[in-house]
Each structure stands twice: as C-alpha cells, then as structure tokens.
C-alpha cells in the first residue's frame, strides 16, 4: 500500500512533471535571447543635409516617393528618415503659423469668447429671482383670504343644535330625530313619559319617519297601542304592534315584557318613573351614556 502511494509522478509524453522534466520542457522551447528595441536612434542631420531638405521643402511640402528617394541618395540617409523629416517639418510649420496668427490677432479671439460669457451671465441673471409686478404680489394674500373665508364661521350656514331644536313642539319632525335616531334604549326613553302624554295628540306625523328605524329582527312583543294613546298611534305605519322590539336587541326576555302603562313595574331600561318627566321640561332631561 505504501509502495503504491510513493510511486513516481505520471509521465507525460515521456517527461515526468518533476523539476528535471520541466527543465527539459523549457529547454526544448526556443525563446528569443535579444530584447526588443525600445526606441529608434535619434538621427542628427548635418548642415548640408538640412540645406538640401529645406530646398525640397520650399518646392513642395508633400514630396512623392521618387523625390524622397532622390534626396535620400544625395544626403546618404534612408528614405524613411527623409519621410519622417518632412512629417516633422510640416508639423513645425503649422505650429509657427498658429503662433503667428495668435500673436497678430489676440483681441478678436477674446472678443469671440466674451459674448458667450455675457450671454451666460445674462442667462444667470435672468435665472435669478426677479421681483414680480404689484398685481401678482397680491395673489398669495388673496388665496389666503379665500382659504380663510372658506373656514370662517360666517360663510358656513350654522348647523341646527339638536337641543335647541327640541324646544319646538313635538309635532315637528326635527325635534324627534336627534332622540329617536339613537339606539333602542334612547328611543324608549323618548317615549318613556306617562300614557297621558299621547292622549289627544296626533302622533302619526311624529312616528311615521321612524318606520324604517323601528324594524328589528326577532319575535314581536306585546303591542303597546292602548286606548288611552288614541287611534292615531295604533293606525300609524310605525305602530309598534307590527314592528316591535327584538328580544335580542334590548337584552331582555318575554318574561320582562310588562305592560307599558305599568310604570311601577321593574323596567329593565335603566330608568324609573321619576325620570319620565314632561318632554318640554328641558331642565329635567337625563341622557343615558351609550
């Protein structure tokens, strides 16, 4: 087992991957020994060579291949050096022309750039805050006054107070709405007066708006339309004999449903006979917190 582990490296094309094999592999590959030339040697021209080149440059700035070869033979230099000299000479000539034009016309160049700056400055000043005319300055105040007038109490029609509306006679419907639109105990409290309260009164118009509010699911209780209450209550569409209170809505059973006229009985509506005072006496009103 140990001999299997200590076996030499596998051979790749007859060469192991050990250090000697890698050396043989590298030695088989040929690398260039001479380094690459980084830059050309700088050519120095003599005065005679420069005179010949300048004479040709005065004739033409772009000599063809034949002219360059002829000049190269005269000055004893390769044609590529002559081509590079003409290239550099044209660049030097363009630079001299730009410098001469820049020195001759410095002010027009500045004038060309100054209008752009002036326009930018004008645009920046225009972008700043400019005082609006007096007519537009009143706009925020007018809008503020409009909003104030919207929320001012004078512009809103006063909402009728339920308590003040209750001072009107009981025949008007506005007096009965704040009391009878509440839950069932409040409704019975509004009718909790003695039976003589309904005598001689036409309560048909008073109870007719309560027709949809008095309907409740559940078994109906004993009718409260008594002879002392008059025929108007029994014949009104809101007669409680047809609608009735649900046993589940008021939280008491049929055993607790005593006679409506019997005020001395133990009513389960959290008030006694002393609380059922005259409807018009506002000082004796007692509202139950629901």
UniProtKB/Swiss-Prot annotation:
SUPFAM superfamilies: Homeodomain-like. Keywords: Developmental protein, Differentiation, DNA-binding, Homeobox, Nucleus, Transcription, Transcription regulation. GO terms for cellular component: nucleus. Residues 38-97 bind DNA. The keyword Oxidoreductase does not apply. Signal peptide: none annotated. Residues 94-103, 116-129 have a biased composition (Polar residues). It holds the Pfam family TF_Otx. Its main location: nucleus. It is found in: Nucleus. GO terms for biological process: anterior/posterior pattern specification; eye photoreceptor cell fate commitment; positive regulation of transcription by RNA polymerase II. Transcription factor involved in anterior and eye development. Promotes the differentiation of both rod and cone photoreceptors cells in the retina. Together with other retinal homeobox proteins, acts as an effector of a cellular clock which, depending on cell cycle progression, establishes the generation of distinct retinal neuronal cell types. Acts synergistically with nrl to activate the rhodopsin promoter. Promotes the formation of anterior regions and represses the formation of posterior structures during development. This is Homeobox protein otx5. It comes from Xenopus tropicalis. The lineage of its organism: Eukaryota, Metazoa, Chordata, Craniata, Vertebrata. The gene is otx5.
């Amino acid at each position: 087992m140990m001999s299997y582990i200590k076996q030499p490296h596998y051979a790749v094309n007859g060469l192991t991957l050990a250090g000697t094999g890698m050396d043989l592999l590298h030695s088989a590959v040929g690398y260039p020994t001479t380094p690459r030339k980084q830059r050309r040697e700088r050519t120095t021209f003599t005065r005679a060579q420069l005179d010949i080149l300048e004479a040709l440059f005065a004739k033409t700035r772009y000599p063809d291949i034949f002219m360059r070869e002829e000049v190269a033979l005269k000055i004893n230099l390769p044609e590529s050096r002559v081509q590079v000299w003409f290239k550099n000479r044209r660049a030097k000539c363009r630079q001299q022309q730009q410098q001469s034009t820049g020195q001759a016309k410095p002010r027009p160049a500045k004038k060309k750039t100054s209008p752009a700056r002036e326009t930018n400055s004008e645009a920046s000043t225009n972008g700043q805050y400019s005082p609006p005319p007096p007519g537009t300055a009143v706009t925020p105040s007018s809008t503020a006054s409009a909003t104030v007038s919207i929320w001012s109490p004078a512009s809103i029609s006063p909402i009728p107070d339920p308590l003040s509306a209750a001072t009107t006679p009981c025949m008007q419907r506005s007096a009965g709405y704040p009391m009878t639109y509440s839950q069932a105990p409040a409704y019975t409290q509004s009718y909790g007066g003695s039976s003589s309260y309904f005598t001689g009164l036409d309560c048909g118009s008073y109870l007719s708006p309560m027709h949809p509010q008095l309907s409740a699911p559940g078994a109906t209780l004993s009718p409260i339309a008594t002879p002392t209450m008059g025929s108007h209550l029994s014949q009104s569409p809101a007669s409680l004999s047809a609608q009735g209170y649900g046993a589940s809505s008021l939280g008491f059973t049929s055993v607790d449903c005593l006679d409506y006229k019997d005020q001395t009985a133990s009513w389960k509506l959290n008030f006694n006979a002393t609380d059922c005072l005259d409807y018009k006496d506002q000082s004796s009103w007692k509202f139950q917190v629901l």
